């Protein structure tokens, strides 16, 4: 079919229908959302849970949500800015941090529903494929589906780091190894060791070592926060191991204590009758003095 020019006449504008607001803003992929939200008709009022992952410039947001007519209901949430509490103070938006955030979300959710002792997940990080299966005689594994939003789902994307963390944490999320770092599209093989290196931050550690040898100034500029916190390439794996253990020990969110604000009285107090009379007398006196000066001059 050749090029067809759109004729923007009266009929075009009369029949024109705008897309949804969040589509116009480039925030929601409604094609994907429809498939993630609509539940099987034989499941009636059972919610269809989504694991929402969003990566911003300084944070990674992970949430478990389900859709209602009124809007999405958030069941549980975890953020990368919580990781300093668990010992990860730098690199809060890399692949290793995404894994930690996904793990934190999974452990927090299972703790909330009392399933954390039944579904431990994969404690030893191997980077290999792992799937959670329901235990007989116990409540079934918590199942949800990955919602990557408008992120480009290429191999090695940080969204899949959060997914792997959640699966290792004990959530049942349908997935394959094709989008994890270490998968070779040509040979169709998955190298779990490469994936484990990314989870443990060894790709960052290797780059740190490279810059230390090649360009000292670039290293100091790029990894200034690592230097400030005394984090070396050799100690990075241990840092993430401790963080994973700390997350499993206590995934519960701690609310910030409310700041007590001292209220300042802004409205002025009313003047008494005597004060009002005194002010009138002062104004009269100043007016008369000004009149006398004007007469003398």
Swiss-Prot record:
Subcellular location: Cytoplasm; Nucleus, Nucleolus
Gene Ontology annotations for the cellular component aspect, listed alphabetically: cytosolic large ribosomal subunit; nucleolus; synapse
Protein name, entry field: Large ribosomal subunit protein uL18
Membership in a protein family: Belongs to the universal ribosomal protein uL18 family.
GO BP annotation list: ribosomal large subunit assembly; translation
Organismal lineage: Eukaryota, Metazoa, Chordata, Craniata, Vertebrata
SUPFAM superfamilies reported in the protein's UniProt record: Translational machinery components
Subunit structure: Component of the large ribosomal subunit (LSU). Part of a LSU subcomplex, the 5S RNP which is composed of the 5S RNA, RPL5 and RPL11.
Molecular function GO terms recorded: 5S rRNA binding; structural constituent of ribosome
Assigned keywords, A-Z: Cytoplasm, Nucleus, Ribonucleoprotein, Ribosomal protein, RNA-binding, rRNA-binding
Bias type Basic residues, positions: 255-267
Free-text function comment from the UniProt entry: Component of the ribosome, a large ribonucleoprotein complex responsible for the synthesis of proteins in the cell. The small ribosomal subunit (SSU) binds messenger RNAs (mRNAs) and translates the encoded message by selecting cognate aminoacyl-transfer RNA (tRNA) molecules. The large subunit (LSU) contains the ribosomal catalytic site termed the peptidyl transferase center (PTC), which catalyzes the formation of peptide bonds, thereby polymerizing the amino acids delivered by tRNAs into a polypeptide chain.
């Amino acid at each position: 079919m050749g090029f067809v020019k759109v004729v923007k006449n009266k009929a075009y504008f009369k029949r024109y229908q705008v897309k949804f607001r969040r589509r116009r803003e480039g925030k929601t992929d409604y094609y994907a959302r429809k498939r993630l939200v609509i539940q099987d008709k034989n499941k009636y009022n059972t919610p269809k849970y989504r694991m929402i992952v969003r990566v911003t410039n300084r944070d990674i947001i992970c949430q478990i949500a389900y859709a209602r007519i009124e809007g999405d209901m958030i069941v549980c949430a975890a953020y990368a800015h919580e990781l300093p509490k668990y010992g990860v103070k730098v690199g809060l938006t890399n692949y290793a941090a995404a894994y930690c955030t996904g793990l934190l979300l999974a452990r927090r959710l299972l703790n909330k529903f009392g399933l954390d002792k039944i579904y431990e997940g994969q404690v030893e990080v191997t980077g290999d494929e792992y799937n959670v299966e329901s235990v007989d005689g116990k409540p079934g594994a918590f199942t949800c589906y990955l919602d990557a939003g408008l992120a480009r789902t290429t191999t090695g994307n940080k969204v899949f780091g959060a997914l792997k963390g959640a699966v290792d944490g004990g959530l049942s999320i349908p997935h394959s190894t094709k989008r994890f770092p270490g998968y070779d599209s040509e040979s169709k093989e998955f190298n779990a060791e490469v994936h484990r290196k990314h989870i443990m931050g060894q790709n960052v550690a290797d780059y740190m070592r490279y810059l230390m040898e090649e360009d000292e100034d670039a290293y100091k500029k790029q990894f200034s926060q690592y230097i400030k916190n005394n984090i070396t390439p050799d100690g990075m794996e241990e840092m993430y191991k401790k963080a994973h253990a700390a997350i499993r020990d206590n995934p519960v969110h701690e609310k910030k204590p409310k700041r007590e604000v001292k209220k300042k009285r802004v409205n002025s107090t009313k003047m008494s009758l005597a004060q009002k009379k005194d002010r009138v007398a002062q104004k009269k006196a100043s007016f008369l003095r000004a009149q006398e000066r004007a007469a003398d001059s």
